[in-house]
């Protein structure tokens, strides 16, 4: 399975680092093994937050639906809102099981996931959304991540 793989919404929304590893650690064999593992878990769509379109064509060739929303260095509220809406739209299909990934599970990704839980109205308490993500990931969210969670 990919490094740092976690279900955020069991059987529906997951997160991990880049399939096959990121940067210099990426390996084709590892990527192929992780793709097979993801398929065995029912994942059928990849939502990439990578700056480049790295591997999107490969994902499409093996049957994944792909989404690409490059997340730059300075994440704006506007770009996060676009990402929240895109995730919501992707998950509106009951058959879709979505994996969100970036090169590494960095500071922004947990904030985006907690923020999505609020944005989509699955949760209505930003502090509870933060707590849920901290429990799932087994680590506290950074101030940078917390800043991405919408307040009501």
Give residue ranges: language-model regions:
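Cys-dependent protein tyrosine phosphatase-like superfamily
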Residues: 1-99, 112-152
């Amino acid at each position: 399975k990919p490094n740092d793989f976690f279900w955020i919404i069991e059987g529906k929304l997951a997160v991990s680092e880049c399939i096959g590893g990121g940067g210099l650690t990426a390996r084709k064999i590892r990527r192929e093994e992780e793709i097979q593992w993801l398929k065995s878990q029912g994942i059928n769509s990849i939502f990439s937050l990578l700056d480049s379109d790295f591997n999107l064509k490969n994902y499409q060739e093996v049957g994944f639906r792909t989404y690409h929303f490059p997340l730059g260095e300075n994440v704006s509220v506007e770009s996060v809102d676009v990402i929240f809406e895109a995730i919501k739209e992707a998950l509106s299909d009951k058959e879709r099981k979505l994996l969100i990934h970036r090169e590494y599970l960095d500071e922004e990704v947990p904030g985006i996931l907690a923020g999505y839980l609020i944005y989509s109205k699955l949760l209505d308490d930003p502090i509870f959304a933060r707590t849920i993500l901290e429990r799932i990931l087994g680590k506290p969210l950074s101030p940078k991540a917390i800043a991405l969670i919408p307040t009501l």
